[in-house]
Amino acid sequence: RVMSNITDTDGKVVSAVIRVGRNGDYENLDALVMDATNNLIDEVYQDDPKLVAIVGRKLLADKYFPLVNKPQENSEALAADIIISQKRIGNLPAVRVPYFPANAVLVTTLENLSIYFMDESHRRSIDENPKKDRVENYESMNIDYVVEAYAAGCLLENITLGDFTA
């Protein structure tokens, strides 16, 4: 359930990236996320009210920057502030995650993502290092990040925003 390029009905790659913008594969991020929700997520999960669009800071900024990057009347500035404060992409709440890839969107529920810790895997060693006048702490732990139900989510990657007029 990963969309990283655009293919035709025969499965032939039309575009190596997902082009979002004028004359692209999608006109805006909202259309891309709505299409992915309707076609890549199993029908059972499509209407789940807990679905969110997990994005990095850059995609969110690229969506909302044009709203604020122009001189505006007070009423228009207030409307832009309200739109930005809602942070929605494709009619889903947008969740900004640090260190998430800049050109990707993950559509799923937050409950579908889990962290597992292996029992008794936490290892720790504390060494005193008088040569450097410090105490050195070494720690390691076996941690696994899991998507519980692949049918309840999809990943959109290789998203390129721009104007694709020839």
Residue map of PLM features:
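Alpha-helical scaffold segments that mediate packing/assembly in large oligomeric complexes
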Residues: 1-39
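Generic ordered-secondary-structure signal
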Residues: 1-2, 49-50, 54, 154-161
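Short, catalytically relevant binding-site loops at active-site mouths
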Residues: 8, 58-62, 149
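Sequence/fold signature of self-assembling virion shell proteins
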Residues: 10-15, 19, 23, 66-166
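Ordered core of a single globular domain
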Residues: 24, 31-70
